[in-house]
Amino acid sequence: MKNRTIASFLMNRMKRPENRIIVLTGGRQTGKTTLARTLFPDYQFLSIEDPILRGTYARLTAAQWRELYPKAILDEVQKEPSLIESIKSVYDQWTEPRYIFTGSSQLLLLEKVRESLAGRCIIVELYPLTVPELETENWAEPVVPSPFQKLLSALDNTQEYIKSLLPDFALDPAYAKKLKAWDFYTRLGGYPALVNPELDDEDRYLWLLQYVRTYLERDVRDLAALRDLEPFVRLQRYVAFQTGAILNYSGLAQQIGISTKTVQRYIRYLEMSYQTLILPAWERNKSKQLVKAPKLHFLDYGVLQAITQKRGTPSGQEFESLVIAELLNKNAASLWMRTSFTCGPLMVKR
């Protein structure tokens, strides 16, 4: 089992008196439930996906929650939004109870959380494993920050830090482990289930194909209530082939044969279900030299391959998406491009 960078942050936050509710959200199968149960073994685990138990929990009063479940993990809590109001009542009346909500739908979960728990909770997003996390063997092994993460924390002394990386990364004693993690990441992505040593690459690829099917059949139907998935599938596949490209809604509408508003809605579904990131153009001012059109990036290369049904070395744009996804956990990133489109460096705000 791989360690997660965010683990120590969650444990420290839950010790604070003001952080009595943590909302842990992210895409399906990113390890939210495993992380919560591993870090907080003394918390009772309540599966809100169970339709029978769901009704039982919904009937509990605030006093009963405090008595029966003073510390609990509510898994997939968006399935029963009324529970959020119940926990809010517990929070407002007592200081001892602690709760962790997990959920895979950003839209269904966070809209209710923002309505009911504003100022009462912290929201943490969990993405697939990063390269430094893939290097770990277990929870006890610390996650070593990547050179880029270290560079961002050393901006006051950048030149000295860069010199410390020379003459060659290959001289690093951990080079072999890092290379293995990077190879895995650029072939299969970072979903935790894929690191099971009993799986071979063919098993992993089949898992990714099933993940995409499950995402369409469950997440998209829950999120968008779509009766006909075929137009959404066409758009998903088209933008997967175009990951890292400038996002042009009207152009996509013409290519796929749906309205621009429908394209915008479908793109929003992809983003809200943690499949893609819309990276805005860098805008310090209104200069005409800046391109304001955003880029769309898929957040996991393994899922991208399953959608496009291709394997092999990432293309230039796919590699760009790999890098963006790797940086997402740690940094706020924005794109800056000249109107000539001849170069597109990444601007990262410290």
Where do the protein language model's features map onto the residues?
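Hydrophobic anchor at the beta1->P-loop junction of P-loop NTPases
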Residues: 21-24
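Hydrophobic positions on the alpha1 helix immediately C-terminal to the Walker A/P-loop
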Residues: 35, 39
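Conserved nucleotide-sensing/catalytic segment adjacent to the nucleotide-binding pocket
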Residues: 56-100
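N-terminal pre-Walker A segment at the start of P-loop NTPase domains
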Residues: 1-17
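Accessory nucleic acid-recognition modules appended to NTPase machines
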Residues: 195-350
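Conserved lysine of the Walker
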Residues: 32
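Interdomain motor-coupling "hinge/lid" segment immediately C-terminal to the ATP-binding subdomain
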Residues: 114-232, 236-240
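Sensor-1/coupling segment of RecA-like P-loop NTPase cores
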Residues: 92-113, 270
